[in-house]
Amino acid sequence: MLGGLILMGILASILPIASAMVLHGLIQLTSNGYRAWLNRKDIVWAIVTTLFIGNMLAMTGLAFVAFSPDRITVLLALGLLPYVAWALPKNLALDVGKKPVGLLAGAVVVTTNLLAGVGGPILDVFFQRVQLTRHQVVATKAVAQALGHISKVIFYGGFAASAGQQDWPTLWLLCAAIISSIAGTTIGKRVLDKMQDATFFNWTQRIMLSVGAVLIARALYLMPA
């Protein structure tokens, strides 16, 4: 999730937004798909199914809306996401294990994914009250986010195709990025195995807020005087 936030910030800074969205979606689909495979025994499929239905409901509604946010909007949205998640009341009983909440989570996260390129920070909010281990959280979120990235690739694929190929990175660079994401996921799995649940949740939030601050600063810097 953290790697995806940083990667989207970099891609949004150097590529047209539609191309950045599709490229990020492909890389993160590989990363999250591999993460889900590594943790496949811990996936809670009941939650994944509910999130998927919410995704489809949101995609159906968004299919009638053609929008492609600009670079500043994406960077600002990326930076604000961790703070929005952090500012929500801690006693907010959003347990993704409950079907109505799962449907809401699926719809909200895919909408956020299409606007900012990532939905992980918001998805986190819905997992704070769920009775799962850190392995189950990571595994289930990996599948959920893979589905979200598929939706993003489908949504922005048309925009990217119409823009032509001149702004796309070379094939070797794309392959290198995918291989790096797989390597990072493998290392992350080993680190996850050694961490305690409390440490995992505490450090994730701190790092996310720090990255968010950098992205907000970048968006403000790009704003016209």
Could you tell me what each predicted segment is?
Residues 1-6, 116-120, 139:
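Hydrophobic alpha-helical segments that either span membranes
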Residues 4-8, 24-27:
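Short amphipathic alpha-helical segments
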Residues 5-17, 34, 38-113, 124, ...:
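Juxtamembrane transmembrane-helix boundary motif
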Residues 17-25, 131-143:
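Membrane-interface alpha-helices at helix entry/exit sites of multi-pass transporters
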Residues 21-36:
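Alpha-helical membrane segments and adjacent membrane-interface helices in multi-pass membrane proteins
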Residues 30, 50, 54, 58, ...:
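Alpha-helical transmembrane segments of multi-pass membrane proteins
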Residues 136-158, 170-173:
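Hydrophobic alpha-helical transmembrane segments of multi-pass integral membrane proteins
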